[in-house]
Amino acid sequence: MTTITDEVLDGPHGALPVRTYRSDAPTGHGLVWAHGGGFAAGDLDMPEADGVARGLAEHGITVVSVDYRLAPLAPGAEGVRHPVASEEVGFAFTWATGSGTARGPWAIGGASAGANLAASATLRLLRTGGGLPALVALAYPTLLAVQPEPDAELRAALDADPVADRFGPAVVHAMYANLLGGDPADADAYAAPGLATTEELAGYPPVLMVNSDVDELRVSGELFADTLRRAGTDIEVVREPGTQHGHLNRPEEPAAAVSIGRVAARLLALPVHPLPSSPDEPEHPARAAPAHPA
């Protein structure tokens, strides 16, 4: 059984809701997770958030799902710009590691735009000297504001499947222009982690990247992976066969459970932190709602 608790943190930009999933047979491992939605959509109830968290909790992993602030969904609508969401995801990670909800190790991860935020938050922690995640789990990430052209093999697969061919350069340009409130060409490595250099990525923690198969966005993920390798990062890249972008948000597809299992296996392979020597409870700077079993 999994116990789910909704909490509101005093985040860097105001109230920050998070939802924590705790297994009744916890392993001690933890993951802070960010859903996707093009930076402007998505919530804690979507399969890419709730379904992923429940699936990982079934493996004994404690999951903190972050309800970060969104960019405007339409012109004139309310919303925030970069770097608000990235900073909130990083804050949630730091909070989780000191919350006492799991012994650790703690990982950070996300899907699509959420994977961008997880990668960005990790880069910020690396640069500022904050505690780093033991693993960065990126599912079909978007990591470049200016979308590179796919190779001939991927281009042919996209041309053969118009439903999958929906993240071309114009779409990605508009998505990042909305996130930034400006020209995507001016994006920095916090907004587009794929821009980070090998020098900037030195010391980056291990990465598991699970890409969708017929997905133009995987080009940016593969380029980021190449840079991480040159920087000396331990990185594993998997392409989930037969999938389109966002397969974690379609739990009816068998690949969703397969990908969740990959993340669980990689995280569970990490040694659990020893029990603390002090019985003191860590600070928990949040207002908690009553837990409910699910």
Where are these regions (language model features)?
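Alpha/beta-hydrolase superfamily serine-hydrolase fold, recognizing
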Residues: T3-A294
